[in-house]
Amino acid sequence: LGLIPRDEHHWYNKSAYFNHNNRDKFAAALDLSDTRGRDVFLKLCAVSDVVVENFRSDVMDNLGLTYEAVSAANPAIIYVSMPGHGKTGPEKDFVAYGSNVEQLAGLVSLSGYEGGEPMKTGFSYGDPMAGTALVGAVAMALRQRNRTGKGCYLELAQRENLTMFVGEHIVDYSMN
């Protein structure tokens, strides 16, 4: 699998942030454009509970690693797709980063000084808020799977997740 071993001798050369967020993790690099990489991926999926992908909407389809293909290897799999702008619509193939998703979701319009231009938030909320929504969705999907024995497909667009921050402002704008 090409697992990357821990560098026990030089852990102190990494930042505290890196060490905190990557403690006890292992990594495997797979070339999913190669048949062998896809085969290893599907073997990993066969023994996994959850698969999360965060590519543009067409990437996993083009690789032949759709929910249907993965669930054939493991019918109980929970497959989560997190495209930045969703799987449908005119912007589905756009690449998404936390900062541009914030702007397109309207979050930056809530920042800045009164009468001034909108400002990017100090912290890029796009990525961690998508991860927060992911945790809740996967927890519910695991509970449902424990009841039914069946896996499922979930789509969580990063841009849609950020609208939870602007919802009341959208309602206020549309009513006033």
What are these regions (language model features)?
Residues 141-176:
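Substrate-binding/catalytic subdomain of NAD(P)-dependent oxidoreductase enzymes
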